[in-house]
């Protein structure tokens, strides 16, 4: 069951996140479903309702993340933590492809998060492409891979 946070808390989280999903960096303004408040560390795993444990998340990222905080890397045989927007900077783990359609991992944490949340599923890539044509993606100031021709 989803917890209801006060409008003041929700507003503070939205402003802090620049109205972006803190995982996939979709802009809430253009989404058909309002973003949700995510517990970075789920309550079931010892997380709490403090602002230091809350993140703005689109419906899809929140649903895919669920209670996950890490995933098993089968090649390495170890758990890799997912990106924690309260402790880490997005640009340290991710960069947009030169065309802005795909999120590229820069680290194992980025790779694990992209896989767990399915950040580059076909439908969202198509939506990003349409948003690029409308000049509303990628987000202003977002790190973009250099085009190497």
Residue ranges and their predicted role:
Residues 1-8, 27-30, 55, 63-149:
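Extended charged
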Residues 1-23, 48:
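Short, charged surface segments at domain edges that flank catalytic/cofactor-binding sites
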Residues 16, 32, 49-53, 82:
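Flanking scaffold residues of small Cys/His-coordinated metal-binding clusters
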Residues 21, 45-65:
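Short beta-strand-alpha-helix junction that forms the catalytic/metal-binding core
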Residues 31-41:
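Short recognition patches in nucleic-acid-associated and regulatory proteins
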Residues 39-40, 45, 74-76:
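Short edge-strand/loop segments of extracellular domains
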């Amino acid at each position: 069951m989803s917890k209801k946070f006060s409008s003041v808390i929700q507003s503070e989280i939205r402003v802090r996140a620049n109205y972006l999903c803190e995982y996939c960096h979709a802009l809430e303004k253009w989404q058909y479903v309002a973003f949700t408040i995510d517990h970075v560390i789920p309550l079931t795993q010892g997380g709490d309702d403090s602002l230091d444990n809350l993140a703005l998340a689109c419906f899809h990222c929140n649903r895919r993340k669920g209670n996950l905080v890490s995933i098993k890397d089968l090649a390495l045989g170890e758990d890799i933590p997912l990106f924690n927007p309260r402790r880490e900077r997005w640009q340290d783990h991710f960069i947009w492809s030169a065309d802005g359609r795909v999120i590229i991992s820069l680290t194992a944490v980025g790779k694990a998060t992209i896989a767990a949340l399915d950040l580059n599923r076909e439908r969202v890539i198509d939506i990003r492409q349409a948003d690029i044509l409308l000049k509303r993606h990628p987000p202003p100031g977002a790190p973009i891979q250099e085009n190497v021709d």
